[in-house]
Amino acid sequence: SCERTIEIDLPAHEPKLTIDCHLMAGKVAEAKVSHSMHSMGNSNNFSALPDAEVVLFENNVSVDTLIYVDDNTEEWWDYEIGVFVGDYIVKSGKTYKVQVNQGNYETAYGETVCPGNSIEISEIDMSELLIDSFPDYWGEGNYQYYRKGKLKFKVSGPLDENLHYFLSITDQNEDAPMYMISNDPIIAGQEYNISDGGVYPSQKLYFSGSSFNLNTVLTIELNPESSWYGETDITDGLIIKLEVQNNDYFEFMSKLDDYDQAVYNPFAEMVFLPNNIEGGYGIVSARAEYEKTTD
């Protein structure tokens, strides 16, 4: 082995505003606002900017001014910087701009289009679902019960080639999605769902947009191996959720996942997070959710 000291003259860093905002159709806008730092800077100098002016524009018309909330219960990248919250409901199909002004920095803004959903879920067939169990590790002799087996439903409607679609299924009284798998071509043919050369159970299944109308019956296998969670009530309904992500959100979350996978890997390639902010750094993106609940 050999050792060598390499000295590099890094250029001076001009701090810029950073914006982290992921809009959701039907919800109010929230944004985390801070400032950039030199890569070798002291993280103790990282601070919130509660006096910033954060304005939401819809189709180039100002519709909301977000108010700073000092929410210390939620950390952003391990820093407590609070969040700016609005009261205007975000709508599908609209173009939104989040603009930030703060006296010490250049004005920064980012734009995105909030997606809508054109896919319908119908003809849900639960007849092939079974009840299984596993030992309750917290109570000797007790068992946790859950549903498994095939769930079928029809998905129909025009897909948008600029959007990304994620399916998940939960019990009405549970937060964690069930593990599931599908060999349907629109699922199994997606590289996103493939790991180590095969399709494995996942808590969400991905299919991408295209220019054709979707009209197929999906067969989903719920909890094909087992379950980590028991259901509080195995007689209540299931929630089939379709999350529709615009490309800004999809690309950011994909790169963020790559970053999380690379954090403790010294041989991993550097991950560059997407940036669509003019005059600063960060991301403004949007998504929508559609839910269908079984009886």
Which ranges hold each PLM region?
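A sequence/structural signal for flexible, mid-protein segments enriched
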Residues: 3-295
